[in-house]
Amino acid sequence: MTNVIEEKNENYPIKIKECLSDYKPIYYRGNLSLLDKPSIAIVGSRKASSYGKSCARALAKCAVEYGAVVVSGLALGIDSEAHSACLENGGVDVFYPKRNQAMQKRIEETGLLLSEYEDGTRAQRYTFPVRNRIISAISDAIVIVEAGSRSGSLITAECAQEQGKEVYSIPGNITSPGSLGTNKLIRDGAVPLINFDELFEDLGLSKSNKKIDQIFLSKTESRVLEVVKGGSELSIEQIRHIIDIDLAEINAIITILEMKGLIFCEMGKVSIANLWK
């Protein structure tokens, strides 16, 4: 179910209010309080290179380790890599707008979906710059991972600069058309991001030291987690057979453990989240 929060509501996201003069009602699913947590936007080209994808995934994983929320737009390429890596490593993320249904469902359960548009609104050329200004507004820092000279992510960087946000850019091969935008950002004053730890230290964050034993688990949840830790990739049916509980209960427990960032479930296969390996 999609919720809406009006402009005059006292709980309207403060980050959007502070950055935008023309803010509108926000439609959302998931945990709106994530907007109060430290966050970084990870954006870039849809036609990402293997280098760009690798950087996006590594940065998202690092964000999880520092306890930061990952924000992106769920476009192909860099955005999708960032969301996927964040979920795989037990993190939480926010994306705007709602597009990929499978990813949308997973983020809805553990993170936040956010849009200025009602369900059913078709994406138009003008909606993407609108999206980009929201992405930068709800983020504490913006990282452009890989971008050509006409990449839409450069609009996000421009919005961030107008909003007084720090823009980071990952340097790329100077002979690659896909890195022209990111390299130009650095030339024009963006912070060259060559050490991911420095970004999070700039935000005043330190690496998460939470342990599994510090997270409350019921007796059955603990049993399921132990089974998952003992295997590589197990099907839900295999786990149910080992523990001998009914399918409805095991499905509920899998969902709870995934929401707690302890496991990763995709295509019916369950594995321990990378952060806990």
Predicted features and spans:
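Glycine-biased, small-residue-rich flexible motifs in mid-sequence functional cores and linkers
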Residues: 2-277
